[in-house]
């Protein structure tokens, strides 16, 4: 039996204020329940109504055709994402509203109104056309977190080109793999980007990648740093020179709802990265609606999601979701602690940010740096907080709620994936009570099921299993680019007929889902299956601990031994006494079964460039393997792994 034992008890419940609830889009549990039941009973009627809030050049014949794994949404409908994100607003009072508020790491500011952005996007769409880009061609975008990244994405969608954004922190090798797989015709990059006061050599990386990736005919370079960069005449072009020569009118290409919108690569733990393909109509409709309801967006909001556009969160909730809603979206180029650990809070106060969406890994860093930094700032503009990227442990949730939100801002703890396109499980901030550590309830139209290894539903609220989705939803991935077999193998083979997320979860008596981490991060200790996230949450609840990552290593007696890698808060030092204290603390919080066999103190944990802990590498280190295997292109700092290996 493939069931997870859940041993973390978290009973605290928090409620949105009456004032928040009264003004929210969805105001009560009853309203949520009524709409949710309708969305499941009549998905065609429900999603047809939502999609009709957007502009379609031609109406659809059928809202939903077919079932998992190959549903089609809004069949026969024609639309254009850039038209809906820009032209729709430019025809209203929003033309002069700020669309993007940008701050560079060195401190410069730019504000683009909807009218400004509309003109820039059309100009760059014409640039792409002049470089020979046609509908269906792939364009790779390798840029820092600057407005040109959003402009390039929207310009691709305007002419029906398929964008593939590659995070600016990736190496030349990772970039080359992604260009080759997509067979991109044009690469858009910059002379460099700023990060922690240094310069990221994007153009040099691009040149290196193109020695290996030969499909690219043209490279467009944004002048960001002013650094001297190598140049290939005929192939390389300055962004500003091409833009000066381009007209600012470009009619949007009417796109079939199921035509490709973008490819985004997600790392497999082995083998080459997977190119997740999203399509136009369903993705647009779903990110529009989730942004509106999950973040309770109003016209006067200043919304800031701290993700980079190189990740799905940046696609859906920095660029497309906010702009489809006519919102003001904040973009920041640099690190959260540059030049000091209060950079984020400075930005919140400076621009009057009202909705703030960030990752648990960032929140744990803020905790480590101490309450003094946010304490220097008012933060009184904030009305709603969100988290994304991994489960948030209750301790970090409570810190976020009290220290950043001052106890007055609801928190939406959102579960979703690159593959799902948009938020799948969350609380709706005016409708639901919040439970720290629980993501919440399914969004409209989402039908989750927790299954055991025999494909049977897990009914016991204290038991976890595999988190699956049993019905199609509009923004789901349609395939893995160029590899339909891998698509079926990866997502639909484990539990036939349903989408398997790869995550473990449990559902409590109130229908709230708690995400227990990746199923391949499950420990099997003396016949008990334990989720690593619960043990990590117990460790982080100790006052000395900043972050923890728990993995298993083979053990001849227990099957797996529990190894915890722990970083400490400032003011605490590693010692054998502290190791014993932490082991006893976990045993007390969870039970003796979860007591770590080994605790290793470290100054940092190996993370991806989006801040997720790479437990796969820690498993190899814990097992004493000298050679690190598998794809490490997303690893942010290789020296962390080397130091951990030396300390082993």
Swiss-Prot record:
Mg(2+) binds at residues 540, 542, 545. Its EC number is 6.2.1.1. ATP binds at residues 389-391, 413-418, 503, 518, 529. Keywords: Acetylation, ATP-binding, Ligase, Magnesium, Metal-binding, Nucleotide-binding. Its cofactor is Mg(2+). It comes from the Bacteria. It is an enzyme of class 6 (ligase). CoA binds at residues 195-198, 313, 337. One of its GO terms (cellular component) is cytosol. One of its GO terms (molecular function) is metal ion binding. It catalyses: acetate + ATP + CoA = acetyl-CoA + AMP + diphosphate. The modification N6-acetyllysine is found at residue 612. GO terms for biological process: acetyl-CoA biosynthetic process from acetate. The keyword Cell inner membrane does not apply. Acetylated. Deacetylation by the SIR2-homolog deacetylase activates the enzyme. PANTHER family: ACETYL-COENZYME A SYNTHETASE (PTHR24095), ACETYL-COENZYME A SYNTHETASE 1 (PTHR24095:SF14). HAMAP family: Ac_CoA_synth. Catalyzes the conversion of acetate into acetyl-CoA (AcCoA), an essential intermediate at the junction of anabolic and catabolic pathways. AcsA undergoes a two-step reaction. In the first half reaction, AcsA combines acetate with ATP to form acetyl-adenylate (AcAMP) intermediate. In the second half reaction, it can then transfer the acetyl group from AcAMP to the sulfhydryl group of CoA, forming the product AcCoA. This is Acetyl-coenzyme A synthetase. The gene is acsA.
């Amino acid at each position: 039996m493939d069931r997870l034992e859940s041993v973390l008890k978290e009973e605290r419940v928090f409620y949105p204020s009456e004032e928040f609830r009264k003004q929210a889009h969805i105001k009560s549990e009853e309203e949520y329940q009524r709409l949710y039941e309708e969305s499941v009973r009549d998905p065609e009627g429900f999603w047809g109504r939502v999609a009709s809030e957007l502009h379609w050049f031609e109406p659809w014949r059928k809202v939903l055709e077919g079932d998992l794994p190959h549903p089609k949404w809004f069949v026969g409908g024609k639309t254009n994402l850039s038209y809906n994100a820009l032209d729709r607003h430019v025809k209203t009072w929003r033309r002069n509203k700020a669309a993007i508020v940008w701050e560079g790491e060195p401190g410069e500011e730019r504000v683009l109104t909807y009218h400004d952005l509309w003109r820039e996007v059309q100009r760059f769409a014409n640039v792409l056309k002049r470089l020979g880009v046609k509908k269906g061609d792939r364009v790779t975008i390798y840029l820092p977190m600057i407005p040109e990244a959003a402009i390039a994405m929207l310009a691709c969608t305007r002419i029906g080109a398929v964008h593939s954004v590659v995070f600016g922190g990736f190496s030349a090798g990772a970039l080359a793999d992604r260009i080759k797989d997509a067979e991109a015709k044009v690469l858009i990059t910059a002379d460099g980007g700023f990060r922690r006061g240094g310069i990221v050599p994007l153009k040099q990386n691009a040149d290196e990648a193109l020695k290996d990736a030969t499909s690219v005919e043209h490279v467009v370079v944004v002048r960001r740093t002013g650094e001297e960069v190598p140049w290939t005449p005929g192939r390389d072009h300055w962004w500003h020179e091409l833009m000066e020569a381009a007209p600012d009118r470009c009619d949007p290409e009417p796109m079939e709802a199921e035509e490709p919108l973008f490819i985004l690569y997600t790392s497999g733990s082995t083998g080459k990265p997977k190119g997740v393909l999203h399509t136009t109509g369903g993705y647009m409709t779903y990110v529009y609606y989730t942004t509106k309801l999950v973040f309770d967006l109003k016209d006067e909001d200043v919304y800031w999601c701290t993700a980079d556009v190189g990740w799905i969160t940046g696609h859906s909730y920095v660029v497309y979701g906010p702009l489809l809603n006519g919102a003001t979206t904040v973009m920041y180029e640099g690190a959260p602690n540059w030049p000091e650990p209060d950079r984020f809070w400075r930005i919140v106060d400076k621009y009057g940010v009202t909705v703030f969406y960030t990752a648990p890994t960032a929140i744990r860093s803020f905790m480590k740096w101490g309450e003094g930094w946010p304490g220097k700032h008012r933060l009184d503009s904030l009305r709603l907080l969100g988290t994304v990227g991994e489960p948030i442990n209750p301790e970090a949730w409570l810190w976020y709620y009290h220290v950043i939100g001052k106890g007055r801002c609801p928190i939406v703890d959102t579960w979703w994936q690159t593959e799902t396109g948009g938020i799948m499980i969350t609380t709706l901030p005016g409708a639901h009570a919040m439970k720290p550590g629980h993501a919440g309830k399914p969004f409209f139209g989402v039908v989750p099921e927790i299954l055991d290894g025999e494909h049977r539903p897990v009914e016991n609220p204290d038991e976890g299993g595999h988190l699956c989705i049993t019905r199609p939803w509009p923004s789901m991935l349609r395939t893995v680019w160029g590899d339909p077999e891998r698509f079926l193998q990866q997502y639909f083979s484990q539990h036939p007929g349903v989408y398997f997320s790869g995550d473990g979860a449990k559902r409590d008596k109130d229908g709230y889902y708690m995400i227990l981490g990746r199923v391949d991060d499950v420990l099997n200790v003396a016949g008990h299956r334990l989720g690593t996230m619960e043990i990590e949450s117990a460790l982080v609840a100790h006052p000395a601990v900043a972050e923890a990552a728990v993995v298993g290593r083979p053990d001849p007696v227990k099957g797996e031994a529990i190894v915890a890698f722990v970083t400490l808060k400032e003011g605490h030092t590693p010692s054998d006494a502290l190791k014993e204290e932490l082991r006893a603390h976990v045993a007390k919080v969870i039970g003796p079964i979860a007591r770590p066999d080994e605790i290793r103190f470290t100054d940092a944990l190996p993370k991806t460039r989006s801040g997720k802990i790479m437990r796969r590498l820690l498993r190899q280190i814990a097992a004493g393997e000298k050679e690190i295997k598998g794809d490490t292109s997303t690893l942010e700092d290789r020296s962390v792994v080397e130091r951990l290996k030396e300390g082993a």
